[in-house]
Amino acid sequence: MLTMNNLLMVLVQALRQHRWLCLFGVAYIFSSVGNGLTQTLILGQLLRWHAPPSTLTLTYMLATLPGFIGSYLGAMMYFVTYYLGSASYFMWMLAAHILGKAAGSLLAKRLTRNFNKVQIFGYCAVLAGVLSIALFFAPKSVFVLVPLTFIISTLYQATTTLMWVMMADVADYGEWSQGKRMDGIIFSTFLAVLKLGMALSGAIVGWTLGFSGYVANAPEQTSLAMHCIVALFTVVPGLLSLAAFATLRWYKLDDQTMQEINLAKMQTIVKG
């Protein structure tokens, strides 16, 4: 998000000096709307086809790849540069993150064969949250941070994969309770919340660093700025992961409930 914020500040300054550049802003807005509609249509169709979670996850990752590069990797670069003291460790952290995401998708698929997916989501969210917060207190050593990053990324990706399974369950529940599928509405709502979360996270990062006295490109940062940089990369994601676990108390579509719903749908089809 830091990289994205810096680029946006340059854009705002350019718009102030050259009003005609506003045309590019309008074009960007229409492009974003078109991109959102495309993602909604594609993923909505995949849900109607009952595509496997791995396909949904891969489609989502490809659709959000530019935002991922501009936000998470930017934050990781600042964390590595100022906390570990050398940007050369960035590739190690990035490799651990990418391998963790691949392992998380495989882990979720294997666990859902024998365990309740809602419980697995909760366990992974809690473990990811606790380990992410523990990362704040971990020794400043690449030999500790890289393995922890791999484990945390694995757990986060497992929850992401399970989220798509749960979204498909919501679509099936909507069809059972309302008599029609609402895949487009479900995904477009999710996408809108996702975009809102990305916007708020970028704003929170900028406000926090501004409050902490962060100075861009400075060889050293103040103690408060350093703590904020590390907290934004560790504690904040951990707390949000724990908050995601807390919301499961309102999610009632466990495996047993979905079996009953699918059975009722099959009986309706047979009678019809």
Swiss-Prot record:
What Pfam families does the entry give?
MFS_2
| Family of the protein in this entry | Belongs to the sodium:galactoside symporter (TC 2.A.2) family.
Q: Where are the transmembrane segments?
A: none
What do the Gene Ontology cellular component annotations say? plasma membrane
Q: Name one GO biological process term.
A: carbohydrate transport
Q: Under the GO molecular function aspect, what terms does this record hold?
A: symporter activity
UniProt name for this protein: Uncharacterized 29.9 kDa protein in crtE 3'region
Stored PANTHER family: MAJOR FACILITATOR SUPERFAMILY (MFS) PROFILE DOMAIN-CONTAINING PROTEIN, MAJOR FACILITATOR SUPERFAMILY DOMAIN-CONTAINING PROTEIN
The record's listing under InterPro entries reads: MFS_2 (IPR039672), MFS_trans_sf (IPR036259)
